[in-house]
From Swiss-Prot:
Subunit structure: Forms a heterodimer with SMC6. Component of the SMC5-SMC6 complex which consists at least of SMC5, SMC6, NSMCE2, NSMCE1 and NSMCE4A.
Protein name: Structural maintenance of chromosomes protein 5
Subcellular location: Nucleus; Chromosome; Chromosome, Telomere
Region: Flexible hinge, residue numbers: 441-627
Binding positions (ATP): 59-66
Statement: the UniProt record of this protein carries the keyword tRNA processing: no
Residues in coiled coil: 134-156, 186-400, 628-805
GO molecular function: ATP binding; single-stranded DNA binding
Length: 1065
């Protein structure tokens, strides 16, 4: 069952000093006397009675201070969107209730105004009452506006969620808000009227300019019209002449074509007679050509038969010639075999002589060689040393192989590391390109930092979106949703001095919009979570946010300090399904489920938990993971491999040199062994060689060749082959004689065939020439016949056309009036066309003329007169606008300048008391552009900087809060509004500035001439200066508090004074 919460104290009389004895406090008309809330946000029932001057509403976070601000805004016809909390008014009703109520009582003479708003949750609508009577929203808005209450003006009403928007207001918006807030009622009206009149003046000037241009063009057209009237009549005369020429031209054309027809008809008849004669002459030639072709074909048949016979005889001759060549080849082979026998015998004798000579030489050497001493000890010694050298070489070869294998492995590993580092570098490059595309100023600052790191005393970390590496891409959305975009692109410093140097250079000098933060002096990166993650596993949590990513130590320290990433657990869908149990059983302030983020706040008094949730947006910057530990390990491994490779190269060089030395020694020992072995076996070798050589001589002497016998056998074989050749020659001569006689016969037939072919070609040429002439004659006849037909049709068409041009019937003769008119005109087509072109050229000079030109001319003159009168009226109206603008500008600008001077005086004084500098001035780009006027606020908080315009980006949050408060205070004494509301403006201020600002608040808001002020704050510094005109409203709530109507304030004050006296004793 839900525990109901009520505001337990009224603060209207809770002051440090009772002021009833001084008379009733003065109230400004429209100031708030009472605020009543029922089922509104955190309250069941609550009534607040503020004082007429400064009201300090104090209470812990979650007690309902801002709920009072929301009630003021919504109760005075404000829109929910202005509060920056929710778009629907129904969402401001307490959860579980169907309707809520807000009632505001405003001071007014003679009777206060009570505005009531009842909110329906189901329909999201509101019912309005004024002084308990039903009314409309428009009536409420008019009543509120009549009291100069502007809850949509940030200069008057500044909710907690809209504090940042004040700094984001443009100069133009700030001027309009200030005019509405403290200017006389007519000031903003004059400003709006000036803008409207200036816009109308521009429009009227453009209209006048357009009309003057139109008048000039119309005058030029009217002048042309006068000339066109005279030219019209002259043009008409030329047109009549063109019409008569066009009537005569078809008759002349008809006569020309008729004459052509007669001429073509005569030529066609002549061509027909010529064609008949040519056909009669061509018949004999055809007969002669046919006879020649028959004789020519019979000769070709005889030539072919003779050629076949010649081919057969030629083949027989070739066969006999091949047989003769074969016999010649057999004789050559017999002679070649005989020569080879002779050469073989000569070679045998030479080998025998050479063998005897070598035997003599070896015998001589054998006589000189004696038995050598025993060489075995020397050979054994050489063998032992050679074996030792070979073993050492084998060992070195093995070592070289091992070293080479190790080098190859190390080089392969180095290549793998280089590839992996390249992949990591590519990921870093992609992240930098994303930074450049989204935040160009931050990327420019990054490039400057990398070139100027030597200027900083301590480490400077690049933007967090580059240095944070999420270990798993699917977890990137948790980190990005937890860290604001401004901090994602922020540079992280370890030294405040380094950060100021960085900001002065980039913000002030280079005008770049960059963010920077400073890590805590004491590192928080290793801070342990209050609850081990193992205890949260049962709720579906698998890790704290800090364990999901890597970051440099300063960045991690800042995130732990600012965002408590070591205390924010990340869960799964299981966590989402049991979220109510998680919130109830754990003391977590922020948690993440699979797709949502939950923020839990606990009321200080009721101990109830309030949670809000939001869907996680997809990750944009941290999708790419770069494992810095892996990169560092890879770089260290790369250095180690480099040293190992250098060492291996040295070992390899030493082993190669040793191997080369052993190889030389091995060769020397082998040569020594060879020489010793040769010295011991030379005599045996010589004796063996001599015995072998005697054996080869015996074999050579046992196989002699009988050359005479071989020669006789060769002659017998050659004689038999020659007899066969003689027979083949006789047969060949018979075939040759037959071949010659057949060729002579063939030649005679070819000569006859050639003569017949020549005669046939001559006859065909004559026939072809006759055929060409016949076809030409036939073509000429057809062309003339076709032309005659076409001319006949043309004559008929032209005659018909000529009669139509003269509006005549088909059987009517040319009237006399046309004959008379035609006599004065040219008689040939060329002359008529030339005359027509000349007249048409003249007519073409009269372009744009018509019968209505006279009427248009008079009409144009009337329009000119009307336009001139309109221009005079517009000029008069424009002068009236300029006079009105001048008068209104004087009535608006002079009071505005005085007002801004007064604001500047107060604003500068406030800043001077805070040992800072601030200015307010009227910013004008062009005096005539009233929609561009604006108020410019410039501030300076540090001696080493210049005055800078107040913007959302340049100043820190605390500096913007101080500037906003002091500007609102500067408006306070000048303000016409009945009350002003500022919600938690001291957030982000340092204690010194907060104390100074509070003292200024008290001093300014507690004057007699100032209106009511509401200052909402969750905390107050100790030992502040208070004023008896202040009203302190303490907000307490919880399930065990007394109800508001049972609170005895006097009894509480007596008890407090009694306790105070006891403390003094």
């Amino acid at each position: 069952m839900a525990v109901q919460t009520r505001l337990r104290a009224e603060g209207s009389q809770l002051r440090l000093c009772d002021t009833h004895h001084a008379g009733k406090p003065r109230s400004v008309e429209g100031s708030i006397v009472r605020i009543y809330m029922e089922n509104f946000l955190t309250y069941d029932i609550c009534e607040v009675r503020p004082g007429p001057n400064l009201n300090m509403i104090i209470g812990a976070n979650g007690t309902g201070k801002s709920s009072i601000v929301c009630a003021i805004c919504l109760g005075l016809a404000g829109k929910p969107s202005f509060l920056g909390r929710a778009e629907k008014v129904g969402l401001f009703v307490k959860q579980g209730c169907l309707k809520g109520l807000v009632e505001i009582e405003l001071f007014k003479v003679p009777e206060n105004i009570i505005i009531t708003r009842e909110i329906q949750v189901v329909t999201n609508t509101s019912t309005w009452h004024i002084n308990r009577k039903l009314t409309t929203l428009k009536t409420v808005e008019e009543q509120v506006a009549a009291l100069n209450i502007q809850v949509d003006n940030l200069c008057q009403f500044l909710p907690q969620d809209k504090v940042g928007e004040f700094a984001r207001m443009s100069k133009i918006e700030l001027l309009e808000a200030t005019e509405k807030s403290i200017g006389p009622p007519e000031m903003y009206q004059f400003h709006c009227k000036l803008k409207s009149l200036k816009e109308k003046e521009r429009e009227l000037e453009n209209v006048c300019k357009d009309k003057v241009n139109s008048l000039e063009k119309m005058k030029q057209r009217a002048e042309r019209y006068k000339q066109d009237v005279d030219r019209y009549h002259e043009c008409k005369r030329h047109l009549d002449l063109i019409d008569m020429l066009q009537r005569k031209r078809p008759w002349v054309e008809y006569e020309t074509v008729r004459q052509q027809h007669e001429d073509v008809k005569q030529r066609r008849d002549q061509a027909k007679e010529e064609l008949k004669n040519l056909k009669e002459m061509q018949s004999p030639l055809t007969k002669k050509i046919r006879e020649c072709e028959e004789f020519y074909n019979s000769l070709n048949m005889k030539i072919k038969n003779t050629a076949d016979e010649i081919k057969g005889v030629s083949q027989k001759c070739k066969e006999k010639q091949d047989a003769l060549e074969m016999k010649d080849k057999q004789i050559s082979e017999i002679n070649q075999a005989l020569r080879m026998k002779k050469d073989e015998e000569v070679d045998r004798k030479k080998k025998i002589l050479s063998a005897y000579k070598m035997i003599d030489e070896w015998n001589n050497e054998l006589n000189t060689v004696t038995d050598c001493e025993n060489l075995q000890p020397q050979i054994d010694a050489v063998n032992n040393e050679l074996k030792h050298v070979q073993e050492e070489r084998a060992n070195i070869d093995s070592d070289i192989g091992d070293v080479t294998t190790e080098k190859i492995n190390q080089e392969r590993e180095n290549g793998r590391i280089i590839d992996r580092i390249g992949q990591l570098n590519n990921i870093i490059k992609v992240k930098e390109e994303t930074l450049q595309a989204r935040f160009r100023d931050t990327h420019s600052a990054l490039m400057w930092l990398r070139k100027n790191k030597h200027k900083f005393k301590k480490e400077v970390c690049e933007p967090m979106m580059l240095t944070i590496n999420v270990k798993d891409n699917k977890h990137a959305k948790y980190v990005e949703n937890h860290i604001s975009t401004n901090d994602m692109k922020a540079f992280v410093f370890e030294s405040q001095e380094d950060m100021e140097l960085f900001l002065v250079e980039l913000r002030d000098r280079q005008k770049l919009r960059v963010n920077a933060v400073c890590a805590p002096d004491k590192s928080c990166a290793e801070t342990l979570p209050s609850t081990p993650i193992e205890e949260l596993h049962r709720y579906g949590f698998f890790s704290y946010l800090r364990e999901l990513f890597d970051a440099p130590l300063p960045v991690m320290s800042y995130l732990c300090s600012q965002y408590h990433v070591h205390e924010v657990p990340v869960g799964t869908e299981k966590t989402r399904n049991m979220i109510e149990r998680v919130i109830k059983e754990t003391k977590l302030k922020q948690i993440y489920t699979a797709e949502e983020k939950y923020t839990i706040k606990v009321s200080t008094y009721t101990k109830l938990s309030f949670s809000t949730n939001m869907c996680l947006r997809p990750a944009q910057f941290l999708n790419y993971y770069v494992d810095t530990d892996e990169r560092r390990q890879l770089e260290n491994q790369q250095q180690n491999i480099k040293h190992i490779l250098q060492s291996l190269d040295k070992q390899l060089m030493t082993l190669c040199e040793r191997q080369k030395h052993l190889e030389c020694r091995d060769n020397e020992l082998r040569q020594q062994k060879k020489e010793l072995l040769e010295r011991g076996s030379r005599r045996k070798q010589l004796e063996s060689k001599i015995a072998v050589k005697y054996d080869s001589i015996r074999q050579l002497e046992q196989n002699p060749i009988n050359l005479e016998k071989e020669s006789q056998q060769a002659k017998v074989k050659i004689r038999a082959i020659n007899i066969q050749k003689a027979k083949l020659v006789t047969e060949l001569m018979c075939h040759i004689k037959n071949y010659v006689s057949l060729n002579i016969c063939k030649a005679d037939l070819i000569l006859q065939s050639t003569a017949v072919d020549a005669e046939k070609n001559r006859l065909e040429a004559e026939y072809k020439a006759a055929s060409v002439e016949l076809r030409a004659s036939e073509q000429r006849f057809l062309e003339l016949d076709e032309r005659k037909r076409i001319l006949t049709e043309n004559c008929k068409e032209l005659l018909k056309k000529a009669r139509q041009m003269c509006n005549m019937n088909l059987d009517q003769h040319l009237p006399k009036e046309f004959q008379t008119a035609f006599q004065t005109l040219p008689d040939t087509l060329e002359e008529i066309d030339a005359f027509l072109n000349e007249e048409r050229s003249r007519v073409s000079c009269f372009t744009g003329l018509s019968a209505s030109v006279v009427e248009e001319c008079s009409k144009q003159m009337e329009e000119i007169q009307k336009l001139m009168e309109s221009i005079e009226e517009n000029k008069k109206e424009l002068d009236d606008y300029k006079q009105s603008i001048s008068k209104i500008k004087e009535r608006w600008l002079n009071p505005l300048k005085k007002m801004i001077e007064s604001i500047n005086e107060k604003f500068s004084g406030f800043f001077s008391s805070m040992e800072s500098v601030g200015e307010v001035d009227l910013h004008v780009e062009n005096e005539e552009e009233y929609d561009k006027y604006g108020i410019r606020i410039r501030v300076k908080f540090h001696n080493f900087t210049d005055l800078h315009e107040l913007t959302p980006y340049h100043q820190s949050g605390g500096e913007k809060s101080v500037s906003t408060v002091l500007y609102l205070m500067a408006l306070q004494e000048l303000n016409r509004c009945p009350f002003r509301v500022v919600d938690e403006i001291n957030q982000g201020m340092d204690p010194v500035n907060e104390r100074r600002v509070f003292e200024m608040f008290v001093k300014t808001a507690c004057k007699e001439s100032t209106s009511q002020y509401f200052l909402i704050t969750p905390k107050l510094l100790q030992n502040l200066t208070y004023n008896e005109k202040m009203t302190l409203l303490f907000v307490y709530n919880g399930p065990f508090m007394l109800e508001a109507n049972k609170w005895n304030l006097k009894s509480f004050c007596r008890r407090r004074r009694r306790l105070g006296r006891m403390d003094e004793q």
